[in-house]
């Protein structure tokens, strides 16, 4: 498993956090501010692609 660092808006995070639990992907919250949230996920490349594709899907 690899670590992937993500900077997300609260909109993205609100939608993604339930999916991370559903997909059994571990994450840690590194930093939060008024604009967004930094997280690190521990995932295989296949699961990481699933996460990135889901974030893209939020904006379609």
What are the functions of these language-model segments?
Residues 33-37:
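Short acidic/glycine-enriched loop/turn segments that link adjacent beta-strands
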Residues 10-12, 57-60:
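Proteins with a high burden of low-complexity, intrinsically disordered sequence enriched in S/T/G/P/A and R
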Residues 38-45, 58:
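Positively charged, small/polar-rich N-terminal and surface patches that mediate targeting and assembly
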Residues 9-13, 42-49:
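Helix N-cap motif at beta-to-alpha junctions
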Residues 1-32:
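N-terminal acidic leader/helix
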Residues 19-22, 50-59:
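Short amphipathic alpha-helices in soluble, non-transmembrane regions
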């Amino acid at each position: 498993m690899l670590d992937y660092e993500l900077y997300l808006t609260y909109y993205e995070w609100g939608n993604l956090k339930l999916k991370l639990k559903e997909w059994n992907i571990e994450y840690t919250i590194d930093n939060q501010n008024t604009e967004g949230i930094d997280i690190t996920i521990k995932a295989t490349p296949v699961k990481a692609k699933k996460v990135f594709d889901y974030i893209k899907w939020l904006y379609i």
